[in-house]
Amino acid sequence: VLQRDPRLFEQVDQFTLMGGSYRSHGNCSPVAEYNFWCDPDAAKVVFDLMPVPIQMVGLDVTRNIVLTPSLLTYIKDVNPAMGAFIEKITKFYFDFHWEYERVIGCVINDPLAVAGMLDPTILSGFEC
């Protein structure tokens, strides 16, 4: 879309993405973050052509937000249906983060980027 008609983004004042990392190890190789690793050419196009500022929420940020087993239990107590849903969709990630990173919990990657887009006050950063 950016290559075909960048004017589509003229009504947007910021673009938020979850991808990459700054001073952190990768999640699909020792150095690569999965989204950028899958399609580095697309990532380059976004950074080269995006006509508005990009808010990049990388692994170095998302690794600070962990859904712990105790927090998941609390969510299930407060809202059983929502808790069961969250448990179902995060099971893989709980297992992955324990096996590969020895993190007890589920690192919240994409939802943090969405939350930061909806409420920019929850994230801070620097311009590069």
Describe each model-derived feature in a short phrase.
Residues 1-128:
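N-terminal acidic, glycine/proline-rich low-complexity segments
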